[in-house]
Amino acid sequence: MDELITKHSAIMDEYDPEKRVGLIVDEWGTWYDVEPGTNPGFLFQQNSIRDALVAGVTLNIFNHHADRVHMANLAQTINVLQSIVLTEGDKMLKTPTYHVFDLYKVHQGGRVLPIELIGEGLHLSASSDPLGKTHISVCNLSQWEPVSLELAINGEADSVQWQATILTGDREMLIIRLRS
């Protein structure tokens, strides 16, 4: 996704250097083989932590390119492909993708902040919301290894209130340390 947006943005920048025209990404998300025993025409897919990582990385990419990406639409939202909810009769389940969207909503309407990553295995983005709060979203891309993350924040860290929310599977896969 990053390569596609980067290449399209480069072409658009030639003809629209003021970035008046936005790029719209339509129907992004995972697309796997149909679940056995389901109607192939309905494209039902179970959702897992893998889908949460795809959503997190993709939303980070959109955040990095917020100067050009003005809208991005998940392919499906209910019971199909990378759904945010699954339903059966009167029952409803929020998927890992739902929880990623819930965590990432703090970036909407914000200003992208420059962020530097030293090392491998993590994908992240940062923004400042209209109230001046800084939000950092991090994805650990390792299937097996937990990752330790140390954040160096410019400014007065003692006067800042920190909060972390971690979406994970059976194992703790991300350890966060903050320093000024």
Predicted regions and their residues:
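Short helix-capping segments at alpha-helix termini
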Residues: 14-18, 67, 156-157
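Composition- and surface-driven signal marking solvent-exposed, interaction-prone regions
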Residues: 85-90, 138-140, 147-154, 165, ...
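Membrane-embedded translocation segments of transport machinery
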Residues: 4-5
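Active-site-proximal structural segments of metal-dependent nucleotidyl cyclase/transferase enzymes
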Residues: 8
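Carbohydrate-binding surface patches
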Residues: 121-158
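Acidic, Ser/Thr/Pro-rich beta/coil linker or hinge segments at domain junctions
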Residues: 157-180
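Aromatic/acidic polysaccharide-binding cleft in carbohydrate-active enzymes
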Residues: 20-133
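Phosphate/diphosphate-binding loops
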Residues: 1
